[in-house]
């Protein structure tokens, strides 16, 4: 089964492969978990699936995900940890958090999203680069790499010293534009998928009246939080080229960083996440699906970083973004 999943290849245009690393097919296989009655759901096949990473070598897909609970058998936890250390290819999700919502018969859809098996489906939504949106807000929609107008032609910020009070209104305006564009493009993609029945055979295996979620995602999350934190708590000076476009930043002073158990940074993270999903929810979603968002763990951070210039948190231009919800250090 694992071998079959590894053999699947989609015919895709080069620009698609430039955006998604590893030629993904979005296949996730879950192992482990604890039943609603308290019994372990670990079987011999759980060990066999994990062992494929050792006898066949690591691979991004199928995405092997351990539904983790402290109540899992000790030997299984040790074996999963051993495979993780040797292959760096195992994903862990908190079964204790998800089980009260979805029960014990749930699957991980795409990458990280729980869905009740046979009763729910997800329209995959990739992710929006909220860090690049911050740079667009500062430069009035001008792209710092292409040197052309890509976002809406809003007034750029012209002050040399950048503060959050100055940048925030422009950023909110740019985020609102991005959320609308994001949902519109996803609606088009999902409509065309249904029109050409790419997944017809899979859909035949689940309930007729299925609950649909409309997934969105965020790229550059920790850098975005840290950049806002720098604007709030440090001194950030814009460095401009001869045309006046900001291409770099000089940041002086300390500022709280995401991932250090500092409420000042964590409050920014919560604000950013809630603000963006609220903007997404303002728009009609395909087939009345329920909007959701996630901060994914997959590796598109590299290709997103190649398109994103220097940022106020100190990250250099065109370097990888921190993956998913991970801190930027």
Spans of features found by a protein language model:
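Conserved catalytic cores of very large enzyme subunits
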Residues: 1-329
